[in-house]
Design a protein with these regions (language model features):
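Bacterial N-terminal signal peptides
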Residues: 22-34
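Bacterial Sec-dependent N-terminal signal peptides
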Residues: 31-53
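Structural helix-adjacent loops and short alpha-helical linkers that scaffold large soluble proteins
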Residues: 396-402, 472-488
């Protein structure tokens, strides 16, 4: 990147301000965004179900009052008995995998049989596939759009990491070069000056239209500085200049300075400022537009490229500075699909928040901590943190604090704020809850971002899991947004600690530091009931997401979107129902992805017999303890 001092005239024609009616908010937001001491509740792992060991299988006999929950130990338990009762009853049971190996799957069988039941009085149940059928969207195009968006994001991030494999990251302090002339940023003078409006800056670009990232296959992007603040500089690629006028870039800058930087600095940390200019570059460029084919159902909205943090001796395309690349306004479709002016500018702040979270985490793990690019966070947790950043900015903009258990009316008081920062994460979590047991929550078999809808579900799990973790274990009071000081948890996760831990090990490290169960299997057991028990009457506090009322929000989205997927039901997670009744004799075969759970509900409206549940492999054998299977039970009635 070269920073030149002359200031050309600002091109462009005025554009009419777009007005978006509230009724169209949901359709517009169906395109995804880019890419201390603490006290907490006693986890359910502390409350083990009573066991009975006799001839044959080890049994667990449930003796729970409404609102009670318990956990069956990880190994050896094969039979769960629900005793006979003289009144109505309802139990929610989660069969959970604690495997931490991405891509792993366990095949299980649950037999449910009432005492004295004759064989096959009730037809055997078949576990539903719990995948989203093509017609569940109402419009098949919506499904293709979401899958294409996920696939494009996956392709870029995979290529970006591959491009810097083996490259050395820059360090925060670099020696001044012998020649102080016009050079690229990684050869800048020791004390460069901040940019000024009208300056010309030349960036190197390594991202090709096919989303390949090549450290050597670069071309220059000449841009002009349009707005400068204390922490950000807005620059416009001259290739697409002239569309955004009338103070719109200044408005974007104001939102970044006012809403994004203070929040993300508290939750994630400060950028390293490796180019010493005091700002993060926000580059609106057709480079981003060209990554979307003209006939695509979606579009890339922006990205952060780790190559910009690499030593230029290893990656010639490195700009040696902090840069966020954002979609340029292109109403005439010169570069790809048309991009309305308002679409590019109003969506920019949310995309910038997401990508800035990636950038700060990457710098803390490489530039500042002396790590390599192999220290970058695993995909599932990296995306969970970045999507959480969107929520923090949205809550700040709505003046909401953690722990408020906000419903739809409070969250959507500003439809624009809700649609930009909050709605996308509810949609992702709904995809997860439609089929939690099939979701690759830790990524694919190579710990990468999975393809299509599975990627959205993985991100939904990560966002919801971190939201629950912070709600349960953050230190009370003193938080940046008011309420709990949850930013300490996210700040610790983003950096990875002295050893730059990643993924599950990183979560375990931070959980221990903040009073949560420190072993992944125990943390998952504490989490297991949350997706189905949040805001369920009588459910224990440990099962609650305390900042948002999931049932209220999902019911409202189901109503507002008229059942459009993933909000086809008023609550997306539907347990497999098995009656507590005479004659119950059911067999359910199901699969369980690593670190996920399968949800059952056993219910009677009156007196009921004893029902015995037997959990085995699909071959009818005892489940090996190596599979990390646990059973978590909550009585709700």
């Amino acid at each position: 990147m070269r920073h030149l001092g002359f200031r050309p005239a600002h091109p462009g024609l005025p554009a009419a301000r777009a007005r978006v009616a509230r009724s169209t908010l949901w359709l517009a937001t169906l395109t995804p965004l880019a890419c201390a001491d603490a006290t907490g509740p006693a986890g359910p792992a502390d409350e083990l179900c009573p066991l009975a060991v006799g001839r044959g299988a080890t049994r667990a006999t449930l003796s729970l009052a409404a609102g009670d929950m318990c956990v069956l130990p990880a190994g050896g338990v094969q039979v769960v008995e629900i005793g006979a009762g003289n009144a109505a009853a309802r139990y929610v049971m989660v069969v959970q995998s604690a495997l931490r190996r991405p891509g792993a799957t366990t095949l299980l069988r649950l037999d449910a049989r009432a005492r004295g039941a004759a064989a096959a009085r009730v037809p055997p149940l078949v576990a539903p596939a719990r995948v989203v059928p093509a017609d569940a969207f109402g419009f098949e195009q919506d499904r293709r759009r979401l899958e294409d968006a996920s696939r494009a994001d996956l392709t870029f991030r995979m290529n970006a990491r591959r491009a810097v494999r083996g490259a050395r990251p820059l360090r925060a302090e670099r020696a001044a070069p012998p020649d102080p002339g016009i050079v690229r940023a990684n050869q800048a003078p020791a004390a460069p000056t901040p940019p000024s409006v009208g300056d010309t800056v030349i960036f190197s670009n390594a991202v090709h239209p096919n989303l390949d990232v090549d450290c050597d296959g670069i071309h220059d992007v000449t841009a002009v500085v349009r707005a400068v603040g204390p922490n950000f500089a807005i620059v416009e690629d001259l290739d697409g200049a002239g569309v955004v006028t009338g103070g719109r870039y200044e408005a974007v800058l104001g939102s970044l300075e006012r809403s994004v930087r203070p929040v993300l600095s508290a939750y994630f940390g400060e950028p390293a400022d490796i180019d010493g200019n005091g700002v993060v570059w926000v580059l609106f460029t057709p480079v981003v537009n060209r990554t979307t084919p003209r006939n695509s159902n979606t579009r890339i909205l922006g990205f952060f490229n780790p190559a910009d943090l690499a030593d230029p001796g290893d990656c010639a395309a490195s700009n040696g500075g902090e840069i966020l690349y954002l979609l340029a306004a292109d109403p005439d479709g010169r570069f790809s699909r048309p991009v309305p002016l308002s679409y590019a500018t109003t969506g920019a702040v949310g995309v910038a928040a997401h990508e800035l979270a990636h950038l700060i985490s990457a710098e803390r793990r490489t530039v500042l901590a002396g790590g390599s690019f192999a220290s970058l966070e695993e995909t599932w947790l990296s995306e969970a943190l970045a999507h959480s950043a969107e929520t923090f900015v949205g809550m700040s903009g709505a003046f909401l604090s953690p722990g408020g258990n906000y419903g739809f009316a409070e969250l959507s008081a500003s439809s624009a704020n809700f649609g930009t920062y909050l709605f996308p994460n509810f949609r992702r979590s709904a995809f997860y809850m439609l089929g939690p047991h099939r979701t690759p929550v830790l990524g694919d078999a190579y710990a990468r971002d999975p393809d299509g809808i599975s990627s959205l579900a993985m991100r939904g799990f990560g966002w919801l899991f971190l939201r629950w973790l912070a709600d349960q274990y953050a230190t009370q009071g003193g938080g940046r947004l008011g309420g709990a000081a949850e930013e300490a948890i996210f700040h610790d996760l983003a950096g990875g600690g002295p050893a730059r831990t990643r993924g599950v090990e990183n979560v375990e490290r931070v959980a221990r530091a903040h009073g949560a169960p420190g072993a992944w299997e125990d943390l998952l057991a504490a989490w297991a009931l949350v997706p189905i028990a949040d805001d369920l009457p009588g459910a224990p506090s440990a099962t609650q997401v305390k900042t948002v009322n999931l049932r209220d929000v999902f019911a409202a989205l189901h109503r507002e979107l008229e059942g459009r997927a993933p909000f086809a039901r008023a609550f997306p997670l539907e347990a497999m129902g098995i009656p507590l009744a005479d004659g119950t004799d059911a067999r359910i075969d199901f699969e369980l992805a690593a670190s996920t759970g399968y949800y059952f509900q056993f219910e009677s409206d009156g007196p009921h017999p004893e029902v015995r549940l037997r959990l085995t492999t699909q071959a009818g054998l005892a489940v090996p303890s190596s599979e990390g299977v646990r059973i978590v039970v909550l009585r709700t009635r």
